[in-house]
């Protein structure tokens, strides 16, 4: 790009589960402006979740225009657009009209559970894990796509005739931004569909046959950092902007944290927790209940990671606030937790919806252990925060065993990282330093970095690493005997919650 030195900004489109955002970054990776719009959630039946793809497009395209207008930025000052998105959510549309044939089926939606059960009965569970790196679960796109083709009248015939297209949200947005000229996805999003062979890096013929999905529906799969096409944008003067970066939200956060080498890991502390550890160019098969997924290498090329999800993180603090009403605000939890020197032997296991990685026990249920008359609300609040750190260690221990890599440091992002007590206890229970960055918008930043590298806005990974400023490092302050004693108590508590809901209570 001949005029790249005249460009001042990169825009990240961050399409999430509840809102669409656009964030403008300057050359120093500072946020210049941002816009956000929420959209409707639809729950047609228990366990079903849908979005309107046209509303996603409307909110995302308007935030792009708003963010540029907010800072009086003209399109010719923007080097590129990067896209990061909620993963697995599935859209099917008519290639001629551009209209979706059904609402988007969201990653949380469980409607394809019966399809997954049939895949297991057919003995495909091991094949799916070996080939795609995933577990056989409705979470992923493949069975959602099959459900749409099976349940929308005429969809199967239209798909076989080449009239329908499939995409995750990144693909849908790029199709709309390029006015139907470009039908692509990146390797990180493709690896979440349960249709993609992460070793050959191509759509898997056997999975397509099993689920009866025509290959003609599927997008071209490209690297996470390259120019895919030009976005037509509205606003003053209109214009075109190159779309030059794509990554699923968790992989984008991993790249935004500059975790691009084996053993580097990040944890996003949100409602739940998402942990990813980079494993370099090696797809590590997990024997400890983790997913093997594609991540971004140093220049946006294919790398691999292990991924584990904790179901209840920040949601556990919300439970203290909303149901038990022992705090008025989530931020208060740090104050009360530090009023006592320890949890007084109390362990809270927040298995409200079962346990995620590495246990994968849907029948576990939440419990509090170690209650005595000496236990106060402050102890329970402290035990609740500690449970987030313990669950994180569960996943990281599994990652280190699978990868044969020692965790160098844990990089953190998400809302709960503002809690200094939690971050310090996390370092203590891991025996590893925890690094909290100045820039908290790591997901959007990752998408911006990928786009900026592709178009020459940033020249190298070293340049990006120089911008990754750590606001605070939490060093372990707990000696090993105490650390292991505390963690042994947690493991004992978790074991007592396993298999609790046997259907007889």
Curated annotation (Swiss-Prot):
<dbReference type="GO" id="GO:0006071">
    <property type="term" value="P:glycerol metabolic process"/>
</dbReference>
<feature type="binding site">
    <location>
        <position position="249"/>
    </location>
    <ligand>
        <name>sn-glycerol 3-phosphate</name>
    </ligand>
</feature>
<dbReference type="GO" id="GO:0005829">
    <property type="term" value="C:cytosol"/>
</dbReference>
<feature type="binding site">
    <location>
        <position position="249"/>
    </location>
    <ligand>
        <name>glycerol</name>
    </ligand>
</feature>
<protein>
    <recommendedName>
        <fullName>Glycerol kinase 2</fullName>
        <ecNumber>2.7.1.30</ecNumber>
    </recommendedName>
</protein>
<feature type="binding site">
    <location>
        <position position="17"/>
    </location>
    <ligand>
        <name>ATP</name>
    </ligand>
</feature>
<feature type="binding site">
    <location>
        <position position="87"/>
    </location>
    <ligand>
        <name>glycerol</name>
    </ligand>
</feature>
<feature type="binding site">
    <location>
        <position position="19"/>
    </location>
    <ligand>
        <name>ATP</name>
    </ligand>
</feature>
<dbReference type="GO" id="GO:0005524">
    <property type="term" value="F:ATP binding"/>
</dbReference>
<feature type="binding site">
    <location>
        <position position="419"/>
    </location>
    <ligand>
        <name>ADP</name>
    </ligand>
</feature>
<feature type="binding site">
    <location>
        <position position="314"/>
    </location>
    <ligand>
        <name>ADP</name>
    </ligand>
</feature>
<keyword id="KW-0547">Nucleotide-binding</keyword>
<dbReference type="GO" id="GO:0004370">
    <property type="term" value="F:glycerol kinase activity"/>
</dbReference>
<dbReference type="GO" id="GO:0006072">
    <property type="term" value="P:glycerol-3-phosphate metabolic process"/>
</dbReference>
<dbReference type="GO" id="GO:0019563">
    <property type="term" value="P:glycerol catabolic process"/>
</dbReference>
<feature type="binding site">
    <location>
        <position position="318"/>
    </location>
    <ligand>
        <name>ATP</name>
    </ligand>
</feature>
<feature type="binding site">
    <location>
        <position position="271"/>
    </location>
    <ligand>
        <name>ADP</name>
    </ligand>
</feature>
<feature type="binding site">
    <location>
        <position position="87"/>
    </location>
    <ligand>
        <name>sn-glycerol 3-phosphate</name>
    </ligand>
</feature>
<feature type="binding site">
    <location>
        <position position="88"/>
    </location>
    <ligand>
        <name>sn-glycerol 3-phosphate</name>
    </ligand>
</feature>
<dbReference type="InterPro" id="IPR018483">
    <property type="entry name" value="Carb_kinase_FGGY_CS"/>
</dbReference>
<dbReference type="InterPro" id="IPR018485">
    <property type="entry name" value="FGGY_C"/>
</dbReference>
<keyword id="KW-0418">Kinase</keyword>
<dbReference type="InterPro" id="IPR018484">
    <property type="entry name" value="FGGY_N"/>
</dbReference>
<feature type="binding site">
    <location>
        <position position="415"/>
    </location>
    <ligand>
        <name>ADP</name>
    </ligand>
</feature>
<comment type="similarity">
    <text>Belongs to the FGGY kinase family.</text>
</comment>
<feature type="binding site">
    <location>
        <position position="17"/>
    </location>
    <ligand>
        <name>sn-glycerol 3-phosphate</name>
    </ligand>
</feature>
<comment type="pathway">
    <text>Polyol metabolism; glycerol degradation via glycerol kinase pathway; sn-glycerol 3-phosphate from glycerol: step 1/1.</text>
</comment>
<keyword id="KW-0067">ATP-binding</keyword>
<dbReference type="InterPro" id="IPR043129">
    <property type="entry name" value="ATPase_NBD"/>
</dbReference>
<feature type="binding site">
    <location>
        <position position="139"/>
    </location>
    <ligand>
        <name>glycerol</name>
    </ligand>
</feature>
<feature type="binding site">
    <location>
        <position position="250"/>
    </location>
    <ligand>
        <name>glycerol</name>
    </ligand>
</feature>
<dbReference type="InterPro" id="IPR000577">
    <property type="entry name" value="Carb_kinase_FGGY"/>
</dbReference>
<feature type="binding site">
    <location>
        <position position="415"/>
    </location>
    <ligand>
        <name>ATP</name>
    </ligand>
</feature>
<dbReference type="Pfam" id="PF02782">
    <property type="entry name" value="FGGY_C"/>
</dbReference>
<dbReference type="Pfam" id="PF00370">
    <property type="entry name" value="FGGY_N"/>
</dbReference>
<feature type="binding site">
    <location>
        <position position="88"/>
    </location>
    <ligand>
        <name>glycerol</name>
    </ligand>
</feature>
<comment type="function">
    <text>Key enzyme in the regulation of glycerol uptake and metabolism. Catalyzes the phosphorylation of glycerol to yield sn-glycerol 3-phosphate.</text>
</comment>
<feature type="binding site">
    <location>
        <position position="21"/>
    </location>
    <ligand>
        <name>ADP</name>
    </ligand>
</feature>
<feature type="binding site">
    <location>
        <position position="314"/>
    </location>
    <ligand>
        <name>ATP</name>
    </ligand>
</feature>
<keyword id="KW-0319">Glycerol metabolism</keyword>
<feature type="binding site">
    <location>
        <position position="271"/>
    </location>
    <ligand>
        <name>ATP</name>
    </ligand>
</feature>
<feature type="binding site">
    <location>
        <position position="139"/>
    </location>
    <ligand>
        <name>sn-glycerol 3-phosphate</name>
    </ligand>
</feature>
